[in-house]
Amino acid sequence: EHLPIIAAIPAARRTMQIMSHPRDTALIAAAALIATITALSAQPSDPASYGRRLYHDKAQCSYCHGWAADGAGEPQSNGGAANIRQSFLKRDQLIEVIMCGRPGTPMPHYDDLAYTDKRCYGVTEAELGAQRPSPPPSTTLQKREVEAIADYLLAKVIGRGAVTREECEEMFGPGARSCGQYPNKQ
């Protein structure tokens, strides 16, 4: 019975009028709540697994540090990346290195505001002079993503010793030919 009246109202006003109805407002609030709950439940339950995906895919750390984080990156990389497997860095130190890079080395920073203030090692870009950090990569990371990478490195990489065939096959699949060069896990 209200359809002719609604059809006569211009679309913009009709949208505002519909949106302002208390029932519709409640529906919109419920939809927003469901979307929030869905987004939160989509957060990874295993931060190390999420960190591994970020390490290899989004941040592309493996390009320089290698798939096994042993410093054996891609041939086209700058070379000389740290062997993270031998690192002694603590979680907060790993986070700072990933966020801020390492001035004077090819290690980039993943914080888009790095060195604009003193958040990184207590210095600004101007204070670094010739030791300016490498240009930031095209991808920056959120703090939670950097934390997930650090969690992955601490759980699955740091202190693990030499790369094993099992680690290689976990990465490339059982029986991968390239994994034959690595020893079995002791």
For the regions a language model picked out, list residue spans one by one.
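Bacterial N-terminal signal peptides
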Residues: I28-T38
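Flexible coil segments in periplasmic/lumen-exposed cytochrome c-class electron-transfer proteins
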Residues: Q43-S45, S49, D57-A59, W67, ...
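Short, cysteine/histidine-rich loop/knuckle motifs that typically chelate Zn2+
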Residues: Y63
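Bacterial N-terminal signal peptides that target proteins for export
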Residues: I18-A29
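Ala/Thr-enriched low-complexity intrinsically disordered regions
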Residues: A7-T15, T25, T36
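Gly/Gly-Pro-rich "capping" loops immediately C-terminal to redox-active cysteine motifs
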Residues: A68-L128
